[in-house]
Amino acid sequence: MITGSIVAIVTPMHEDGSLDFPRLRSLIDWHVAEGTDGIVIVGTTGESPTVSVDEHCELIRVAVEHAAGRIPVIAGTGANSTAEAIALARYAQQAGAVAHLSVVPYYNRPSQEGLYQHFRSVAEAVELPLILYNVPGRTVADLSNDTALRLAEIPNIIGLKDATGSIDRACDLIERAPEGFALYSGDDMTVAAFILLGGHGTISVTANVAPRAMHEMCAAALAGDAAKARTINARLVGLHRHLFCEANPIPVKWAVQRMGLVEGGLRLPLTPLAESFHDRVLTAMRQAGIQA
């Protein structure tokens, strides 16, 4: 089981929107040096909706190849077509990812039984360990705790990223989940509490900007050191909040560009961060001790 701070890494792009693989490789090196515990490639923060299937597969391949075992790479493979989700998962397994993260199918609004059948079909088609991803604020469909725990009975479904932000739901999951089933927070603002209550880590947006601090906060929480986790988190609250002042990943890509880590490329329909938000993101970065 991977524990701690797993970054939902941004996808570097040139100003014209083309993929920037040299910057991706340097970002991976930086996360290794900063202590990040794992990488999710081509997730929501990695702009998965606007990359082609070929680009999606190439991003997975390059990330796994360049990480070269120095840091675990989890491949984002979600789709609202079960057949496409299976195809992406098969490629992730072939490329050598340690696991894959599959989001609740969006837009077509399946029932709980439809969600169960979708994820079961993916898990049965591919041996690669599968982490469920519930983010109802984006998908509309909401994977209930009961359905998630039913899916947890399938051997290669190994965990869940819970991005509901609900501590009540997290407590229920932590209490009822089988031993060895990994629970990750997908809500940076509640990560410390989530782990202190018994969660195993986070798949984080903030870790793109403050990877060492996120690693240290998670490590403290996993060790049961609530005071240390709280102290570190206090410096990061501004980032947790203002990296979502516009739709993710717009603010976080602006922040990592300010840090000199990537160019400013985004793909439509995403547009650059509105100037009115620049100061609040910069202030949050400085509060976290980040020079930009």
From Swiss-Prot:
Pfam families in alphabetical order:
DHDPS (PF00701)
Assigned GO CC terms: cytosol
Q: Which GO terms describe its biological process?
A: diaminopimelate biosynthetic process; lysine biosynthetic process via diaminopimelate
Q: Where does pyruvate bind?
A: 45, 203
One example GO MF annotation: 4-hydroxy-tetrahydrodipicolinate synthase activity
UniProt KW keywords: Amino-acid biosynthesis, Cytoplasm, Diaminopimelate biosynthesis, Lyase, Lysine biosynthesis, Schiff base
NCBIfam families per UniProt = dapA
Q: What does this protein do?
A: Catalyzes the condensation of (S)-aspartate-beta-semialdehyde [(S)-ASA] and pyruvate to 4-hydroxy-tetrahydrodipicolinate (HTPA).
What binding partners and quaternary form does the record give?
Answer: Homotetramer; dimer of dimers.
Give the protein name, as stated in the record. 4-hydroxy-tetrahydrodipicolinate synthase
Organism in which the protein naturally occurs? Azoarcus sp. (strain BH72)
